[in-house]
Amino acid sequence: VAVQASREVVIEAPPEVILGALADVGSVPSWSSVHKRAEVIDSYPDGRPHHVKVTIRVSGIIDTEVLEYHWGPDWVVWDADRTLQQHAQHVEYTLQRETEDRTRVRFEITLEPSAPIPEFLLNRARRKILYAATEGLRRRVMTTVASNRSM
């Protein structure tokens, strides 16, 4: 049975800065408590990641995934190959500019676990993933914006 979750957050930065933070997959473990390792396997000609290998840990479950990224002007999507812990995973970040320096970010994840997971563990994992994907991203972007302003 597929599990879905989503969350929106407003970040005080333009979409291109947010997409830049998402493209910097090597730094993801520094702002996402879910990610333990992330490495780019190959990239698109523009330098953005195409395939990425990540190790994640959520609610005591550890998994290594190979993600295939697709990029648009205001979105990024990735899908995971089948692993020991899941049959499939689909993630979307959709960005909507509200003002010059303010963007609404919507994060959506659909995951099909390879085995049944108790509801209390699903709820705990859902909260942790949604927080890392939105608030963690916000902290990372705001750090980037602050350091750019001080230059």
What is the predicted function of each stretch?
Residues 29-30, 37, 44, 55-104, ...:
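Hydrophobic-ligand binding "helix-grip"
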Residues 1-47:
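Hydrophobic ligand-binding cavity/cleft-lining segments
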Residues 9, 56, 128:
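A short glycine-/small-residue-rich loop at the edge of a beta-strand within enzyme catalytic domains
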Residues 19, 30, 48, 62-64, ...:
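Short acidic, gly/pro-rich beta-turn/loop elements at beta-sheet edges
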Residues 9, 26-29, 59, 109, ...:
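Flexible, active-site-adjacent loop/turn segments at secondary-structure boundaries
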Residues 18-22, 28, 52, 105-107, ...:
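Hydrophobic pocket/interface hotspot
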Residues 110-151:
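A conserved amphipathic terminal alpha-helix motif
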